[in-house]
Amino acid sequence: MKIAIVGVSGAVGQEFLRILEERRLPIDELVLFGSERSAGRTYKFRGKELTVKLLQHNDDFKGIDFALTSAGAGTSKEFAETITRHGTVMIDNSSAFRMDADVPLVVPEVNPEDAKNAPRRIIANPNCTTIQMVVALKAIEDVSHIRRVHVSTYQSASGAGAAAMAELETQYAELGAGKEPTVAKFAFQLAYNVIPHIDVFTDNDYTKEEMKMFHETRKIMHSDIAVSATCVRVPVMRAHSESVWLETERPVSVSEAREAFSKAEGVVLMDDPAGKVYPMPLFIAGKDSVYVGRIRKDLTCDNGLAFWCVSDQIRKGAALNAVQILETLI
């Protein structure tokens, strides 16, 4: 099997390399692609030094079975035809094709069969916040249909890229030295702050990030589920957290929910409030699963349930999910 990584020098591209190394897929050849800035760099994979090739409109993808792409929506749109025209299946981490009717949007724990129906040979990876939420929601959906969801996200700096992480560290150092903090990657200072603004605002005053959770959840779950999201950037380096409230068709008890989560694929239950056992990004960064805790009945609605979930958005929220899609196809 011949695999390509497009955008290998980015945070998700580097995670692709690590995950492919860890999971020992039957890869005969791995080809790395990048921009002019990245071309010529070398990375080690399974003991070999691999040189990054410049991504160009040519026949470099001929003979490649799967391409894992994470180079931004603009690059994905520009190069999709180049990547797929010789039969390569493109598993794309960007937002470019997620809502296209003829492109499946896949989370393997939820809708793996959708990956097998990709007429354009493009499969889209959902947004990181959607991925971790639907993995958890699937456990409850299997018990009783979910009518609606309210979710507030607590998204780490790394969700905005490596430069954003560096800026957060710089801000803390500058403030500690009594200096004015550098603000470039975020709308405001993130250190000692939270910012209820991720991506641009739309006409309905929700951000694009929030509307992604609405549209993507419905597509992945093949459901009329209603989703209202508030997405917030928090001064955490890695791993996203979500506070989720949902309403089901019939009441679901806490014990039922715990049992469902404990059996769900891709979920780890951490739910012992009395023992201070609950998921936190400090301990979840670098892990593969969606961690669920703080499960409780809603006090205002008989059919309401609330929980808290945390997941590493670079692994399960991006690179790992794409590799799992690949694994469903081989």
Q: What does each model-found stretch correspond to?
A:
Residues 67, 157-330:
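Charged docking surfaces used in two-component/phosphorelay signaling
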Residues 1-190, 226, 290-291, 295-300, ...:
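N-terminal Rossmann-like NAD(P) cofactor-binding subdomain of oxidoreductases
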